Amino acid sequence: MVKISMKKKCSAYEAGQVSGPLCLDLCKEKSIHFDKCLSTNVDKIVYDGEWKGRKVILKRTLDWFKLFEEVHHFLDYDNLLSSSQHYISSYVEALFGNCTQCDKLKLRLVKHFDDNNDGKVTATEVRSFVTLLHLQEPMMLIALNESKHTVDFYGYCGGLYVVEKVPYTASQVFGATWELKDLSLLPDFLEQLEEIGINMVGTIVDVVFAIPYVCHVLNDALMLAKYYIFTLTSQTYIPNEQEKFEFVYSLMDTTLGISSYPYGMLQSCDLHLGNYGFTNISLLKMIDFDHTYPMIYLGELLMQKQCTSNNDCWVGNVNQCYSWCNDGTGTCNSVVWKHDVTNICQVHIPIIFRGLTIFASENSSCQRKAIFPLVKLCQSWPVITSVQQLEETVLKLKEQLKSIQNSCSEL
């Protein structure tokens, strides 16, 4: 399937219908290779692959083709350069407003028009690049490409774009949980019998652990047994308590770093641990920007929504990017209730500390108990609307976590 798709793309490239800095590598030099498909999403397909011997992630989306036709109708081909520059300027302002570095961003984007660096800008080059900017993730990656907190954007050919591959996602390491039902010992044809047996054992365990004294005595032994069974049946690395805290601190720094970029605050509307990854030097990076928006643009998206109740006022994940309905206007308010750092505190910190621990101890038990008051504290935070407010919130959260870390380590 991918061979047919790339053959069509290269035919379009050779006919001068699509362009991009990686088209030569894809179609002539054959230095881009596709490996395993990582996504079954019909609208957006993601592949493992290589580019000039470097391991990369390749992405393509069907929306690009529809947008490619739409861009054709609003470009002024008689005044190609000036009309496209005006479009870029308007588009950047719509996304980021009048940010301090927006003029530099506009100039940087315009330089991408000449994708083969031959000193000439063609209609195909402009049309291909402008279409790419209409896709949320490529636009955000290109804008933030100099940030150490985002995966590197290597280039594109038409609707195919190539980004840095990180060895591990955070969900693989810090989102790992294990239950008795995950254990698989019998062959596949005995799966039903195995499931019945596991359910029976689970019921017995629940009854036994309902007795307070027995629960206290056996809890540590069970946690230790789960650890050894898990290590025998899974390749997932299990982080220790120190690594969990360090990861949360890195998560805070990454969130603050991305929103402190000179283009203004950002908000992820599909925030989960699978959207973060580690490089070979353990640098945490955000790896998915499909639903990450500048706060100004997100506010506009919300205000454009007609509403009859608060349930109508959300973008992306309904539990993350939501506001409230203005009864007077029948439209949604532009202010998002919860910033990423609040979502991380309320949802993801409990997941991180709920995961498997190498040894069940008073230390880990103390940490898990201390997390619940922290989550309640996060729920009381005011709406974050400025970078300064975000910095103060991140500092406050780090202080609370360090207090938990220090007090529990003394046990």
Predicted regions and their residues:
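Protein kinase-like catalytic core scaffold
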Residues: 56, 149, 161, 285-288
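Conserved beta-strand elements of beta-rich interaction domains across eukaryotes
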Residues: 53-56, 62-66, 158-160, 167-168, ...
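Conserved structural core of kinase catalytic domains
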Residues: 74, 83-130, 150-248
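Amphipathic alpha-helical segments that line or abut small-molecule/effector binding pockets
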Residues: 139, 242-256
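Activation segment
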Residues: 63, 168, 279, 283-285, ...
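ATP-binding glycine-rich phosphate-binding loop
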Residues: 1-112, 131-138, 144-148
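Helical subdomain adjoining the active site within ATP-dependent kinase catalytic cores
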Residues: 1, 5-8, 36, 294, ...
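Catalytic-loop of the protein kinase fold
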Residues: 255-286, 293
